[in-house]
Amino acid sequence: MTQEEMLSQMEMMLQPLQQVNASQAETIKKLTEQNESLQSRIKELTAQVAWLNRQLFGRKSEKLPIIDPNYPDLFAGMLPENAQQIADAHDEAVEKIVKTKEERRQEKKNRIMMEDLPVLEQVILTPDNLDTNLYKKIGQEVTRIVEHKPGQLYIKEIIREKWGLKDNTATAPKGMSGVLIAPMPLLPIYKGIAGASLLAEILLQKYEYHMPYYRQIKQYSHLGMKGLTESTVDGWFKQTMELLRPLYEVLKAEVMKSDYVQADETTTPVMNKETHKAVKEYLWMVRAVMERLVLFYYDQGSRAGAVIESLANRYNFKGYLQCDGFAGYETAFKTNPDVLLVNCMVHIRRHLEQALDENRPMAEHGLKEIQHLYKIEHICDDAQMSFDERKAKRQELSRPIMEAMKLWMETEGVKYSESSLIGKAITYAYTRWDNMMRYLDDGRLLLDNNLAENEIRPVTLGRKNYLFCGNHEAAQNMAVVCSLLATCRNHDVNPRDYLNDVISQMPYHAKASHEELLQLLPHKWKLTHPESVMTKTT
């Protein structure tokens, strides 16, 4: 076969392949055109679906005018001055949301809770710098909040008027928009219906009056609020704690800045999530005596001395720490020369009282000497002595008694077995006597820790009513509320007025400094709210 014949044969063989390639190229071209057409159609349909969703689910007061996406743009040739109006329309469209099923369910629940409550307060907000010559009222946004006053729940309506340009073709003044509405005030709970006064009442009822949630809900039901659940109230409580926690941290720092504090601890049942049983945990209390500030502190329920030691070290505490005879304090600070322990005479007296039936002469002698020490304190109180004068009087009268008691314990106490009640009482007193003697050297120091124990009592009473904390977080939240309420009591501040005000203010203090938050603690707050300082009756 010649070369020409071979080439001819190869051409004949390639012809079918060339025809296939041409056919495939034509098919690819058609498919590409079809794909582009489909992509264009998909974009068009997607835009229409989005537009229909906005019309169907968007809030009626914020709906844009119905515009056919295929309709020619009549404003395409308008001047750049209309850019602001275009931006306004864009912002209004962006604000529209498609509400989830859960949001719609919550709105229905809120309506049911509020439907029987009267509207007793309306706050009408008008946009700033409103020129009524240029703008006309075109609508309003209404937010309904549940507020509380003793014996009544009611609705507070926040009405924000919406104003638009009278002349739709006019240009808004520089820096203004075509539609004006006052900004929404910050609320304690974002999108929540509970106002500051209701949140304050929930805290007050549980931790001041010791009323658990289920009793509160029954009370609110009698006042016209239907459908309220414990989970809802607990959710409100937790969000309120997030608001108040920065105040608590400032209070903690202020307490530990003092150079004379009293400390005590008490138990609080906390639910164990594994065993589902309440476990006895510990809540600490630290009181700045001169400043009358009270801190409750919870650290995973521990009673170890390391808890108070860690707290003191974190804030570099230096000064007197007055406490009972719990060995954890001695262990925590035995190597810290900056912390001087002062013990409590009341605890010493209690041990002697317990020994009265066993050895009356010894116990009565000790009790009589302690009684003399308290009489000296009463003399100082009646004379309204200064701290320096009190110190001098103690050096004159109290020191001889204290030294004589120490000698008595050294000589007489050794005669009795440490297992006997009188032996235990003398051992308890003697091992703490050097710490107790420190009160002689500073007129500010108290003879006992009674004021600290008084702060613990409301927690004990509450424990008998709400029984337990659900978890460690709940116990920490309890510490926050109890700290603020106890400080209010120490400064005669009306706790309802105080909580109502600070819960209202805290949303505006998200980035506040330590000094700014300090002004919201009860002892500072009362200086600008004298009407909320309660006068004591005799």
PLM region spans:
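Short, flexible loop/hinge motifs at secondary-structure junctions
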Residues: M1-I193, D234, Q262-A263, L397-S398, ...
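Catalytic center-proximal scaffold of phosphoryl-transfer enzymes
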Residues: Q15, A22, P127, K162-G164, ...
